[in-house]
């Protein structure tokens, strides 16, 4: 109801009736200050009842009781000390306002103000719902709300004071004991004031908003709810007032307008949650604030908006796209805390608003590479948290970011990424919580986590082991369940992950053996040798723990405890015992940890380190029971009753991988296999048609069957005939394993092997080469394992059959398809037999380990002849190019294998070593690749002499970037291993000449001095080649100047100049080339290091096999390279590179315009020395690079001559597709003969055919092609090319990688069809024949 101003007709203190008295209701006596309070209350109750019963239509009564109404508003009543009196008076006044509406009986504004303030104060009584008077307070509230009595105050100038007091009172008294009616009346009362007034003042708004502040909200939840509903109800009216408030504070910066200014962001959050309409005009102001120059202010706004955008029911991002985009921009804020807050928000957003994931993805991608570790860490937490809630919330791209961070440079980030992925795998793959589709989405995780085991960091390796034990194959599962998990995991891993898992078991087993050896040392009496051995063992163990520096101290302490505590030692012995079960291991670990725990030390780093050690060596997965369970699973797969298909694995794959798994475990846990049941199952596998399965089964018998002969005679009797059959007619791999198995597990092995050797040696038939492979393998391994028994019989086989009948005869004609390499299955049986024959020769010699019969010399001459003849030993031209590549690889590998035996290394001549080295520059990519891998594998195990590491220097000439990168990584690995070995082994100092990496320098210098490409010691281009090869090795050696190594290497080069070449000591040209290479090496060392001028701490020793003893009076201070040449070598100008400088890339057919790419990826083989300082180690698939181009001609084919004009390349960047002027092709003395063959006269190489000639119809006559060798090109190449050859380096002995598939990418030069006139105009055009 609305009130109007009353007529000013009555007095304030009472209008009397006709008789001059105040009229009271019947039965009510006069109410004055003369009566007692109780009496007054009694009379007021009757008055209240009277006014309560009156309505607005009672005009007579209204007039009658008007004096009473005025009397009740007197100061006596308004200030009465008794609260009951005040309550009754307030109820009366509320009814009076109701009865006399719309005209109030009070005319004075001051009196009205006093009355309403009085009524407001009485409303505080609502607080106590248990009060006897609560109903009257409720009546008062109800009356005021229904009548809207407070609206009369709008006419008062200071009505705001009344409203503020009212609002504060109501918000303060509301509590959880009030029912909804109380709340509704309060809302009605307040909302009428807001909605029907002229506006809401800031103070009044503050009285509402203060209840939304978290501190107040937590104190009185009901006042917050009341304010929330009030704001919702009055949103249309109050929104403008709220907008004005935020405008004053946010935009104008007038924080003094309100005490709540410092809480604006909290208020915005609460208001948004209540009703986004309340902030309709505020949001643009936030966009302005997001661009503030104050980082802390931006941070506050970002925190706020993160809550607004991320809240579950918010549609702010779709409703306000500009603000959303502006907010996303803060992901790239310069202020770190802002970026951090943005990333943290993403998690809630992904969970509550999956539709926004697309918008967030790109920003999270950038932040996943943030320079701040904490931000990268939180990106992972964000994505993983959302993924754990529901995998559908994150897309593959987001999971990809986590995948990337598993290789982060910071351990904390890597750990979070790895653990996060592990948790996802366990949740969705192991437990299958979201079905097969989700499991498929994260199936890659298992492979990725295991790949991390390849990282060098011990922390990464330990975490992978922990993840495997807790998430991939949880060790706390029951044995059957655990083995099922492992069985199908192993079957579904990719090859690299399988290798990593195998390596993990191998490392754990190695550490177990170290601990076992340590315990054995404890059993021996104390001595200096014992202490030294124990110290070395402790250092080895410490390297297998995190933070090896600290680990050393802890391991020493643990060793002391072991020495003092025999019971602890016995627990540890039980833990590493081959017979320890998984349950026993768990008990042992807990018992040892309990003994070492210190209750007074909550954080015990010593105990943590010991736990790391125990977790690595404890057999928590595999024991006899586990192996039995695995075998049963495999049997089910064989019988077809397993859940293979359900697990996503085919039965054949499950069987094969199951056997492979058992094979790996047979190395690490051989004792666990010893049971009849297990061996019966393996015998069943031996009878299967799958060759791989049978091979793995034999390997398992070989590794685990040492007690079969004594304990399981039935298994023995069944096994022997099967092994004999496999050795005679199985696959080559089966034959090898069968022979080794017989040798390993049977006591009468001599008899058994003789029963295989004799029939096989008699039945060899060169006319049926496909039936020769397995016999050759068996015979080779038999002669290696039992040389005393079979070395002599083998010699006659070698002389009468192997060399005479097989090697020196070509019975079949190879397919002339022009390819330099073909898949294994396409290799002809005859060539395959020859490859295995060479291996047999090597095994025979390795078994004898002596050269008393001079068989090794003959074999080395044979292998050298094979290399000189490029694989075509008979030189009848009947063998294909790809088969020749196979034989070259086999011959080079054979020499390298023999060099691993000291007695044969001594008789390998420098010429033979150089021939072997040139295989790494073979024209066939696969030959180079496989040879380099074999070389690295032998070097890294310290099996090959140090001189063989010098071969990697030749890889600088490899035209394929991946091969150079691989070679560099091999060098880094080999050098680090040798240095580490010297540090860890005190006795190694006596063998420094064969171990110290720097001692490779003289071998490298000698090898490069005899490089067939190096024919003229003053040719700048050839010297640049030499410099590149030198720097390829020296760059890795000079990374650190350990022990003044730079000066040491310089001293070696200087000392070589005081000697002569032992290979040709009297040839001045040979010695000049040697000294020239020394000068180039000195030039490189001096230019790259300022530390090489210091004196070397010791005089280096030069290998006598390659250098003569320095003569006393000989002084060689001559400089063999001019100052101009020196400058040219050091300027870094790249040598002009041939277009066909790389391997196995498509080339155009003769006369056709080649397919031209938009940009090249790399120049050819002559890359500047500084261009490969840090190459990528990745290797590209050769299948891709061997595909033919659109012209239909591919690498590894015999191609006709290509006449291609080439310009010198100025840098190693990509070469643009430009037509290159033919007259530029002569500017750079291009090494066009990189692909040509050369001659080397090796001992035993006879009947070398004369070079054949080919002339291509599309160009000038090609120079005749000399055979492979170490000498310069033959002078029989014709006068047409002699002058040109003066400016070209001669190619390497093995067809140097030249015409190849990657050459077009390297050069991208077009080859226009030459006309007759062009031939005359350009006499220096280059001819390249891929066959050479």
From Swiss-Prot:
Disulfide bonds: none annotated. Signal peptide: none annotated. HEAT repeats lie at residues 392-428. This is Sister chromatid cohesion protein PDS5 homolog A. Pfam families: PDS5. The modification Phosphothreonine is found at residue 1207. GO terms for biological process: anterior/posterior pattern specification; cell division; heart morphogenesis; lens development in camera-type eye; metanephros development; mitotic sister chromatid cohesion; negative regulation of DNA replication; neuroblast migration. The keyword Phosphoprotein applies. The lineage of its organism: Eukaryota, Metazoa, Chordata, Craniata, Vertebrata. Interacts with the cohesin complex. Interacts with WAPL (via FGF motifs) or CDCA5 (via the FGF motif); the interaction is direct, cohesin-dependent and competitive. Interacts with SMC3. Interacts with TP63. The modification Phosphoserine is found at residues 1096, 1174, 1194, 1303. Belongs to the PDS5 family.
